[in-house]
Amino acid sequence: MKSLSILGSTGSIGLSTLDVVRQHPEKFNVTGLAEGHDINLLAEQIKEFRPDIVSVRDKASAGLLREQLGSEKPEILWGIEGAAAVGAAEGSEMVVSAIVGAAGLVPTVSAIKAGKDIALANKETLVVAGQLVSDLVKEHKVTLLPVDSEHSAIFQSLSGHRKEDIERIILTASGGPFRHTSAEDLRHVGPEKALKHPQWTMGAKITIDSATLMNKGLEVIEAHWLFDMPADKIGVVVHPQSIIHSMVEYIDGCVMAQLGAPDMRAPIAYALAWPERCESGIKKLDLTQIGTLTFEQPDMERFPALRLAFDALKAGQTFPAVLNAANEIAVAAFLDKKIGFTDIPAIADRTMQAHDPYTPSGLDEYLAADRWARDTAKTMTN
């Protein structure tokens, strides 16, 4: 029986994780939950999974949750400190890091320092503070397992192979809903259209990131830290069917790929059960029903966010943290209809150009870069 704490339990990844847990009561139990928005859903999760400790967005939410639960309730905390406490709580062996955005960094670091294995869905943890997190993983001898479908595919395709035999890793991208949309028409895209992803069901922020290709850019940075690969050994190919989740090319010309239906429960189940496997509940793949798999080069002129991510990775220092923070602010402004679709990468670019980079010496300095970028980007969205 593996004990889990889930950071971001009411989000898309959190819900899929609990669905996998629900299928395997003999394998997994939930000791901690943290969420930021949906108190009613969290209350239902608490009643079903009976965790020992939970965290919510703020003190007011904690009061509302206590009222809903009555006398039988777990320890209830709030804020970043509360989520960090859930991540570090005794009793859990693995922490599923699925809080959206840079807000997931501090709780994930807390979990690593407490010696918890990490199932990482929060790519921003590595984008913002990749060097720090990598060093902490080694220091505390924990296992970091990717939950992103692309990185899970690479992890599986690397199994049993030597690093020196790798030619490059290839991340696949669906291309989003606008891969055939002209640059002029992209200027007039609104949130309603951008939130309709052709393959995946995800939360609003990551769906917009997928439409701009920023999500793929952040995944490039994540792959660098997960697999210790330089930028010039990480490629991206558009694969609209989202059946091949990513690939590894070896020096002999052979390519290993992982295929499956586009359902996040598969990489989640793989991370939870590793080094074993367990039933995920996804639809089994039938290639004869799909018929054709196609591939294209990404267009970095129409979708400059991907280029910005490569630039940030190559520049290093605090640039990835700044890119991520500026993008989060711009996406929120787009969803609020304050800016246009093409303004999202433009604001990220302008924020990076205004940044004076430095090499962070600790968590506080990464967070300072994040705050600076948010403040700077906000001035561009008003």
From Swiss-Prot:
NADPH binds at residues 10-13, 36, 122, 124, 203. Keywords: Isoprene biosynthesis, Manganese, Metal-binding, NADP, Oxidoreductase. Its EC number is 1.1.1.267. Pfam families: DXP_redisom_C, DXP_reductoisom, DXPR_C. It is an enzyme of class 1 (oxidoreductase). InterPro entries: DXP_reductoisomerase, DXP_reductoisomerase_C, DXP_reductoisomerase_N, DXPR_C, DXPR_C_sf, NAD(P)-bd_dom_sf. This is 1-deoxy-D-xylulose 5-phosphate reductoisomerase.
